[in-house]
Structures are given as C-alpha cells and as structure tokens.
Amino acid sequence: MAKMIVFDETARRALERGVNALADAVRVTLGPKGRNVVLEKKFGAPQIVNDGVTIAKEIELEDPLENTGAQLIREVASKTNDVAGDGTTTATVLAQALIREGLRNVAAGANPMSLKRGMEKTVAKLVQEIAAMAKPVEDNKTIAEVATISSGNDEEIGQMIAEAMDKVGKEGVITVEESKSLVTELDVVEGMQFDKGYVSPYFVTDTERMITDLDEPFILLTDKKISIIQDLIPVLEKVARAGRPLLIISEDLEGEALATLVVNKLRGVLNCVAVKAPGFGDRRKAMLQDIAVLTGGDVISEDIGLKLENVTIDMLGKARKVTITKDKTTIVAGTDNKAAVEKRIAQIHKQMEDTDSDFDREKLQERLAKLAGGVAVIKVGAATETELKDRKLRIEDALNATKAAVEEGIVPGGGTTLLHLTKKIDAIKAGLADDEKTGADLIARALEAPLRQIADNAGVEGSVIAQKVRELDFNIGYDAMKGEFVDMLAAGVADPAKVVRSALQNAASIAAMVLTTEVLIVDKPEKKKAGAGAPDMGGMGGMGGMGGMGGMM
C-alpha cells in the first residue's frame, strides 16, 4: 500500500490536531463536577462513561495523520491505567498541555532534543519530590476518602472499598461483579488469586477489557504438560454435555491441544480457558493441591496413578466464578469446602512451625494468605444496564486508586500537588543548560493544566483559581465540589502519589516523542470510486452443522 510522508511543522501540527481531538473529549470528565461522555455501541444501548481510558480507546479519527496523534495520547492513558489503574484523564490533560506549549517553542526555534532532555531531567526530580511528600495510608478513613474521590465522590463506594480492605487485608483480593439487584453490596467468600493468566488471548470473553469471566465452571487440575488433544477428549465431552465452562490449570498447554481448544472456544462448542499452574517444582504441586482443596476437586497426577483419559466429572473442582486477565487468575469458590480448607490451613501452619528455612516459611506464608484471606466481592447494582456499566468502571477506578495509595502513599488532590510543584522548578533549572531550561518551563506551565481543567469543569475561571492556589501553602488547594480553598488532606481530598507520579511520567514521555518528531509516515487512504456500489453477493447459503466434540479428534 502507498504511504503518505509528511515533514517538519506539517507533521507535528497534524499530530497536535489528533492529540487535541482526543484530549478535548476526555478532559470534560475531570474533577468532581466533570461531565459524562456517551459512547455509541454497534450492538445494545449506548454506554455513558466518566473514565478517561475507556473514552480514549473508543476514538478513531478519519484523517490518518491526526489519528496517529490520537493513538499516541491514547498510549498515555493506557500506560497510566496499566501502572496505576487511575489518573488517565489527568495524564491526558498534562500531555496535551505539554505538546501545545512544546510545539509553540519548537516553531519559535527551540532545539527539540534539548527540550526533551530538559523535560526528562525535570520530571525525574519532580518524581523524587512527590515520593518525599507522600504520606503513608494507615487507617480506613483515609482509604475511604481516596476511594470516594476516585469514584466521582460516591461515598457509598468509598466506605465499601474501605470495608473490603479491612476484611481481606491490604494485600487481599477484591473483585467487582455485576449484581442482579438494584443494591450495591459487599460479600466476602472463600477464594484465591495467583499470578498466571490465560495462555492465549483467544480465550478472552470480554475483548474491551481483555479478561475472561467464567460462571460456575468446572476446574481440571493437573501437573502434566498437555500437548496431545487425545488426552483431553474424554473430559471435554463430559463437560460439554454438562453445559458448563471449563478452566484447565496445568503445567503447560501447547501445540495441537491448545489449537483445538481455541478453535472450539471460538466456534462456541465449549467455553474453556487454559492457564499455567502457579509456582515451580514441589511448590507447584503443593499450590495445585491448595486449589484442589478450595474447589473440591482432585489433582490429576500420574504420581498417584491418575491419568487424564480416566477423569470423571466428580474429580473436577467447582467454583462460583473465575476471572482471568493476561497475568492473574482469581477463583471465587463456593462455601461447600469450608471444613477442608480449614484443615488445609492448619496443615500449612504446622509446616511453618516445623521448618527452619526462612525462605520456606515465607512461601508457606504466601500460600496461607492465598487460602485464608478469601476474596471480597463487590456486587454492583443499578437501575439500568447503562448506569451499571458506568458504576462498575467507577468502582474499578476507585479500587485501583486505593491499592496505589496503600503502595506509595497519598498527596493533596484536586491538581494541588502538581500546581505546587511548579515552585520547585527554579531550583531544578539551575542545573540545566539553555534550551533544557525551556523544557523545565514547559513542565512548569503544564503542571497547572489539571487544576485549571477541574475548575473550568466546575464552572469557574481556571486561570484565576490556579493563580490563587499558587500563592497558598502546599497543602491548600481548591475543593471544586464545595467551591472553597481548603487544606486538601484535612478535607479528605487526596490523590495516590503513584497515580500523580505515573500521570506526569507518561505524559512527559509521549510529549517528548511528539516534539522530537520530524517525519510522519502513514498509509495513504484509498479513494472511493464514484458510484461504485457493492456488487450483488447472492445468497450466503447455510453454514452447515458444526458436528459434536468428535470434531476435535
């Protein structure tokens, strides 16, 4: 396919138009008085969202040059979401401000590479400042405040997440499910999470969030590497007849076996997912046994004379729900195996007492936490499907923000921390060369952008509010919900330091890339021929039967 090649200022301005198109759509959601965005869906009702990364992922521009800019800024939101789980809108607003100011300087003759170096050095110093000023999260009240702010000032969600963390611990597993009722409620159940995800992305059931949800699945546990489909066919046929999904946890699954499972999943013959067993060596066998106890199944191992071809339904584990991402599996078990789980916990306690090795004791402690901690499930209720999806996204954001706050502490929220960091820029500039100082000035101007946007969305003049806050003490900021200047931490308006840090780092990274771009190469759009309608395709004919499970052989 032919390519379009665009140079110099034309290339950078095209990127900027794309950046602005996406950022202008996202930034209206920032702050407690931010508005919503409605996303049209090809199937089903439109989706109403207030989440930066969800909006960013939906935007595709017609002009390929501008679309490249939009994709770059989408990367800012995605990366911030991956690292911190929240702060995607803040990152987008920062990146837009940096690119706008930076391109103005490049057009005026500043050296882009010097600007880039200045920005990088300044951000590195500011990240250290954020870490130094972060206050650790030590009580439930602070956790509730962070969750409330991140969920769009929903106090019910804030209290629920604080309660969930209290019940399963700060390292515990908290999942979010859709409820059948109108009420949002918290449920703590037996369950565990381990650090292995699906072996193939073809297993996902939700392509937007790239996760797999299995309701009431059977679970096949084996310490064997599976590569031949013949071994699995008997158990697959039994599960298919039962009409329930299947989770396979094995040492590995590859080759013909993996290909056949993927094909049958895509055809809708059997909803199945394969994940690798956690741990290594003897520890892997012990963890498989833990999962077996939790789910009421057996580990299929030739060490004890069990073979895959002889597996019966009774040997399979069962769970209420399983959620799998690319790197994590969460099993929410029923309550049927409580006695067996308690017996297993007592056994692990005994092993911990008997061992002399600190390493072994640490690993046993990890297993114990996985088994004993349980899983807190927040069941999201709402009056309509559209509200339910929006509420679920808000709760997931709040949950991520809370975990980030526990990890790296909190700083004053509402864009206050970023704005007050501008006071540190002069000291940083003292160690920079000429054009590098301009890079530091770019960062200083961009740091105002989130607070200005929060104020604008609240219906007041952003530049006036920013100027007033700059003159106040470090903790004092603008509470857009009440329209007052307050001590942000005392008022419960806090941001996780990790979210603020990630937003700044990712925004500066992408902005530096845009400023140092000299050539843009994209596919040339194909011109549609006038009057060329689609030819008559004729009838499609029937699809034919898919055959039974024997088609896998």
UniProtKB/Swiss-Prot annotation:
Keywords: ATP-binding, Chaperone, Cytoplasm, Isomerase, Nucleotide-binding
Main localization, broad class: cytoplasm
GO biological process: chaperone cofactor-dependent protein refolding; protein refolding; response to heat
EC number: 5.6.1.7
Function: Together with its co-chaperonin GroES, plays an essential role in assisting protein folding. The GroEL-GroES system forms a nano-cage that allows encapsulation of the non-native substrate proteins and provides a physical environment optimized to promote and accelerate protein folding.
GO MF term (any one): unfolded protein binding
Catalytic activity line of the entry: ATP + H2O + a folded polypeptide = ADP + phosphate + an unfolded polypeptide
Family note: Belongs to the chaperonin (HSP60) family.
Gene this protein is translated from: groEL2
Keyword DNA-binding attributed: no
Subcellular location: Cytoplasm
Species in which this protein is naturally found: Gloeobacter violaceus (strain ATCC 29082 / PCC 7421)
Enzyme class: isomerase
Gene3D superfamilies per the UniProt record, alphabetical: GroEL, GroEL-like equatorial domain, TCP-1-like chaperonin intermediate domain
Taxonomic lineage: Bacteria, Bacillati, Cyanobacteriota, Cyanophyceae, Gloeobacterales
UniProt: ATP binding residues: 29-32, 86-90, 414, 495
PROSITE patterns xrefs: CHAPERONINS_CPN60
Designated name of the protein: Chaperonin GroEL 2
Subunit structure: Forms a cylinder of 14 subunits composed of two heptameric rings stacked back-to-back. Interacts with the co-chaperonin GroES.
GO cellular component, one term: GroEL-GroES complex
The keyword NAD is annotated on this UniProt entry: no
